[in-house]
Structure formats: C-alpha cells, structure tokens
Amino acid sequence: LFGLSNYGFQGAQVFYNAILPELAPRRRLGRISGYGVAAGYAGAFIGILLVGPFVEGAVPGLGLRIPGVRAGGRASAFLPTAIFFLLFALPLLLRYRPPGPSSGDSSRGPSLPGWRAIAADVRRSLLDTRRYPGVRSFLLANLFFVDAVHTVIVFAALYAEKVMGFPDSVKIPFFLVATVAAGLGSLVAGRLVDRMGPLRTLRWVMAGWIVCLALLTASPNQAAFWLAGCLMGALLGCVWTTSRPLLAVLTPRGEHGRFFGLFALSNKAAAILGPLLWGTVVSLFEGLGPFRYRLATSSLVLLILMGFFFLRGVSEPSSAPGEAPGA
C-alpha cells in the first residue's frame, strides 16, 4: 500500500507541474512557481503540526494535547496524512478547469493506455526532444545537478553527525531552519526568474551551489556549518522554482504533460550517480577518518560542473514553441 500511495504521489507531481504554464503568462511563471514551492515548504511544517498529535499524542514542540487523540506511533500517521492530502488538494481539483482539446473527437472520454503504449509514448517523447532546441540538454543538465542536490539532502544528517559532531537534538532545529530558508529562497527566486529569465537564474543558482559546497566542505566549526546549511536551504528552494518555468518555455503549449513526465523521470534518475560517487569516495579514503566525508561532499561539485556543461546547449527562446511572442 505504501508503494502504491508513493506511486500515486509521484505521478501527481507530473500533472501538478504541467499545470503551471496554464495558470499564468510567461512573465509571471517564476513568481507563481515560487509561491507553489514556498507553500510546499510551509506545508512541511503544517503537516507536522497536524499529524504529530496522532503519532505522539500532542502537538510536536508545543506539548498541546488534543482531547480524544492518543499516541499511536509512526504507523498512525498514514491515515490522517491521506485525509489532509485530499482536503488540501480539493481547491485545485474543484476550481481548476483545464483548456479544452485543440482537436479530435471530444465526445469519447479518455481511455487508459496499456503498458506497451506507455513505453512507446516515453520512447516517442525522448525522440521528440530533438524537435525542440534545448530540451534534451536541459534534461541532461537537470539530471546531473539535481543528482548533487539529492545527495546533499540524503547525507546531510550523516555529515552533520560525523564531521560537525551534531547531536540528534540539534539536527531537527537545523533542518527546520534550513526548511524556512528554502521557502524564503523560493520566493526570491520566483521574482528573479520573472526579472532575469529562468535560464540565467538557474545558472546563478548552480554557481551558488558550488560556492556552498565549498563552504560546507571547509566549515571549521558549527557556526559556519549553520551558515552553509541556511544558504543551501535557500538554494534548494531556488532549484525547484527555476527549473519548472525554464522547461515550460522550452516546450510547446499542449505538450507540457509529456515533457514534465520526462522531467520527473530525470529527477528520479538523479538519485543514482550522486550517492554512488559519495559512497565510493567515503570507502576509498576510509583511513582519513571524518575528513573523508568532506572529500565526498566536495566531489559533488563535479556533478554540478557536468550540469553546467550540458546547460550550454540551452538557449532561452523569446517565446515558447507554438506561442506568439510576448504572450
């Protein structure tokens, strides 16, 4: 059941991202994307407050007990999470009206394709990236630099413990502060996207990640680590805010669903190379003690540089394919 629910959640992200170009004109895509990302990080806090009483019997951090609600352990979090997920999704499900089909017979409802048809459609979508300049290069760039970002997220707690000596009591406040920074960073990035363009903003964000990885690797004390963590949290929000508008302007209206599907595939594939590189460095330099974690973190710069390499093949068009300039 957990695997099925996770499949549904990940699949919903494709449609959620593809809706973005339908909600706002190009000049406001960044701002709307930033609002969505910031709301997601705010939801992380709200979710803890709403579901926490079912797990611990009280509101986390506040100790407030809700009459009739008893602590049920971690397993008791799933049902209320599903209910709240549905409730928060209802405004979009009820108010959003997708544009009508541009052609074809609309009298028949949509049919569910078989697995062979799905595989053929994925293959066709990959081939179609050649028709739209920059799409394939962007997806490859996204694969590498998001790989570095995902790896930092996965191993941040281990790095904080092994290198900086953070106890568990400090880890949670640290990640909460980084989450707040991510929400604020997404709002700032949204305005920068609308002012500078998504491609230029993304390049600055990637450069910022290189600087932050260097700062993280060289952090001499916990204060410097806190600074690096807050900056990386802000840049994390920037990554998700800038990537979606860039893909939206690179692909034609009416085809966003297919290409955001490839975008999601690229993001999921980005969970392979980075952890493998990080783990290999840690294993090879085992004799260096905690310093090996610094080396492993610094090696992630190579992935971001690969992202820069492929991003050279991307040029931001004056208008999306099939869209009138200035729309």
Segments the model singles out, each with a brief description of its role:
Residues 1-12, 224-238:
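Hydrophobic core of transmembrane alpha-helices in multi-pass small-molecule transporters
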Residues 11-24, 238-252:
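Intracellular juxtamembrane helix-capping segments at the cytosolic ends
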Residues 53-83, 280-304:
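A membrane-interface helix-boundary motif in multi-pass transporters
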Residues 84-95, 298-327:
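Multi-pass alpha-helical transporter architecture, strongest
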Residues 99-140:
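Juxtamembrane intracellular "pre-TM" segments in multi-pass secondary transporters
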Residues 154-171:
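Short amphipathic helix-loop junctions that connect adjacent transmembrane helices
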Residues 184-198, 282:
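Helix-to-loop junctions at the C-terminal end of transmembrane segments
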Residues 200-215:
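Structural signature of the two symmetry-related core transmembrane helices
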